[in-house]
């Protein structure tokens, strides 16, 4: 069920403060965050966030089409190594 419109999007306060400070200074430094749950708002466009995926920080450059999504959607947490190809040597007996 989606979030109520009267509540507005959820953004961690510390993350919003960091973006506001960079917007005032007109700088575009990478913002390191563990807040995967924060919703991307229009103030974030053009900024790069280093979103934690559980072991490292993945750089995410925010574009206009990402508004409304969560930061965690763009930093996958699971690595898929692929299915194992059939080993002919072990099957032959």
Swiss-Prot record:
The gene is rpsS. This is Small ribosomal subunit protein uS19. GO terms for cellular component: cytoplasm; plasma membrane; small ribosomal subunit. One of its GO terms (molecular function) is rRNA binding. It comes from Mycobacterium tuberculosis (strain ATCC 25618 / H37Rv). GO terms for biological process: ribosomal small subunit assembly; translation. The keyword RNA-binding applies. Disulfide bonds: none annotated. Belongs to the universal ribosomal protein uS19 family. Pfam families: Ribosomal_S19. HAMAP family: Ribosomal_uS19 (MF_00531). Protein S19 forms a complex with S13 that binds strongly to the 16S ribosomal RNA.
């Amino acid at each position: 069920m989606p979030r109520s419109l009267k509540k507005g999007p959820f953004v961690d306060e510390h993350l919003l403060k960091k973006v506001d400070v960079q917007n005032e200074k007109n700088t575009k430094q990478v913002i390191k965050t563990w807040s995967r749950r924060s919703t991307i708002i229009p103030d974030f466009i053009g900024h790069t966030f280093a979103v934690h995926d559980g072991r490292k920080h993945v750089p995410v450059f925010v574009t206009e089409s990402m508004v409304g999504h969560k930061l965690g959607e763009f930093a996958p947490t699971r690595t898929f190594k692929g299915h194992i190809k059939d080993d002919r040597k072990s099957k032959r007996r």
